[in-house]
Amino acid sequence: MSMTRRYSSTQYSNKMSLQSLSSLLLLVTLFFSPAFALKKSYIVYLGSHAHLPQISSAHLDGVAHSHRTFLASFVGSHENAKEAIFYSYKRHINGFAAILDENEAAEIAKHPDVVSVFPNKGRKLHTTHSWNFMLLAKNGVVHKSSLWNKAGYGEDTIIANLDTGVWPESKSFSDEGYGAVPARWKGRCHKDVPCNRKLIGARYFNKGYLAYTGLPSNASYETCRDHDGHGSHTLSTAAGNFVPGANVFGIGNGTASGGSPKARVAAYKVCWPPVDGAECFDADILAAIEAAIEDGVDVLSASVGGDAGDYMSDGIAIGSFHAVKNGVTVVCSAGNSGPKSGTVSNVAPWVITVGASSMDREFQAFVELKNGQSFKGTSLSKPLPEEKMYSLISAADANVANGNVTDALLCKKGSLDPKKVKGKILVCLRGDNARVDKGMQAAAAGAAGMVLCNDKASGNEIISDAHVLPASQIDYKDGETLFSYLSSTKDPKGYIKAPTATLNTKPAPFMASFSSRGPNTITPGILKPDITAPGVNIIAAFTEATGPTDLDSDNRRTPFNTESGTSMSCPHISGVVGLLKTLHPHWSPAAIRSAIMTTSRTRNNRRKPMVDESFKKANPFSYGSGHVQPNKAAHPGLVYDLTTGDYLDFLCAVGYNNTVVQLFAEDPQYTCRQGANLLDFNYPSITVPNLTGSITVTRKLKNVGPPATYNARFREPLGVRVSVEPKQLTFNKTGEVKIFQMTLRPLPVTPSGYVFGELTWTDSHHYVRSPIVVQLSS
């Protein structure tokens, strides 16, 4: 249909300008008026509930009604409140998640009954020889002294994860040989996951994700199934069955298992396709943690996180406090933002925060040059089609006409010229885009293979990926040599050997470059991470809904895959926690953490101090107390225990007022202890930021072993004088508690910055070691 009447261009322009201007003014007025203020999803946190042990459904309905009534006073009506709220946290966490505008959120935050109001923030996922490396077995044999044997492989402990769901058909979650589900379990399974006596729970939480994205709910958001692979990988690492013949495309063949292979497992799906760089949202995480507490889990593994933040506006910190208060041990990943300092996340003192390090297995894929040079690389990709020398080309020399050379060097999409690449081995630089994406771009350009060279930040950390083409990743120094060869040789040629699994490699462990580092930017007086565990090239169960690279064009499928990240180290500790919970069912979460931390090691398999990705000496900001030793954690001798009251005292010591802490605890009688001092918080590590004069630290040790006398030994941090009183502690019975004090003072001439030492209490059988971290001012 055409218009017969028309304006001259000038008439049309003037008329439209006036109309547009008036419309624009109207839109601006409406947009910035209170009625049209931009709405977002928020969490309104009201603290804890003071429920009786048995809660009726009517009581829970009453809690939800009280949330709506409370919100109605700010949004105009009960109906508006009902429409705005998409989660009511009714059982352990007191609060709700709702769609609010900024003004409403600000007004609610002023109410005296409100602890905090904060945006529904997004979190990132922090993406089996390892158990042999940690000495739970040796050459496939489980010895009598193994924690596996002592703890019955974690039998009937219930371990859950917050992740991308689960692939229930995996053999890692088969219930063959399992007895009845523990009677204490109150959880359930969504209809799309066939649960059994091993996989006893599967639920999804999506309202926070949908509220943030504005997407309508559909079948793809109403499932517990794992379409990413991350959740199945982490859950099976924590508590998957023994599965013989596990491998990735024939490489690394062996028996896969989790840390607590006879534990029961539950999956709480809180992570969805990425949006704005995040997959898992606080509103969903809080709802899942509340459900996990009520369902009866013993251990909660969370391989998710974001930037460290204030405890009262951090969904993971809030939820995990309520879990720990109810006896659930919470284990969190430290993050993958290393090696930069001050990047560690999940720093709340009631969670176990886990860094990532290597182990003594590599999937070696050597790169050989025509001139006889050879570089040790790693890969899980298929071999080259022919055993011959191939032409090599630097990706920087393969850029498209008028293209960005840096993009080409990084092998980014659209940066490579197929005419230059076809049939050759392409040499790319690590950084920016995903390692597997570089392989995909190389393959798309027609490369026969790819060598991926580490950038300086990645150092010696090389990661095995199941690339879509023959490939190998080499370290930074070898990469420099290779690029030099390419630039100085007229006809450079090389070959990538087929990958093979190699054991007993040295040095191991060393810290992964990606593992986030301290110091703790929220509370510098608490050392984080707490511990490190294997997190590089970990083979575990995977989904069959996507390929091992998670790229849309990767049509391959594998029941097991290798992944790296603190996401992988976190469930290693969760599995160890499951064993300790089985062996010592009455230990508190703090006692379990103490046992893991104080029995760890800081030396590698060369009996030298652990190193970082550049093979320089590492320190507690990267590994915390050290690398986990499960068998020693079974009988630590002494523990640094903590109660809910201690955590409340901690909050007072770091500056939260009495009213906020009362709401947090749901205890109107609680009063911040006068003189509460962070230096006396009974943490298993000792950290003193900004030491300028003499200070005294107080700690309490609880005997969990037989009667014994312990003597103090210490290694002083450089420039610090240390004394301990008393120097000897005698325990006459199990459960007895003794107090000691450590005094630290700077020497007249001291270095500036952080310095490190350690304190060990020993009865010649047990060695209870704590790192000492001190910041000195020049």
Swiss-Prot record:
This chain belongs to which protein, by name?
Subtilisin-like protease SBT5.4
Misc? Plants over-expressing SBT5.4 show a clavata-like phenotype with fasciated inflorescence stems and compounded terminal buds. This phenotype is abolished by mutating Ser-567 to Ala which completely disrupts the catalytic center of the protease.
In its UniProt entry, the species of origin is given as Arabidopsis thaliana (Mouse-ear cress)
Q: Where is the signal peptide?
A: 1-35
**What is this protein's function per UniProt?**
Serine protease. Has a substrate preference for the hydrophobic residues Phe and Ala and the basic residue Asp in the P1 position, and for Asp, Leu or Ala in the P1' position. Interferes with CLAVATA 3 (CLV3) signaling, but does not cleave CLV3.
Q: Which gene encodes it?
A: SBT5.4
Task: Spell out the family assignment given in the record's similarity comment.
Answer: Belongs to the peptidase S8 family.
In this protein, the residues bearing a glycan are 218, 253, 404, 657, 690, 732
Major localisation: endoplasmic reticulum
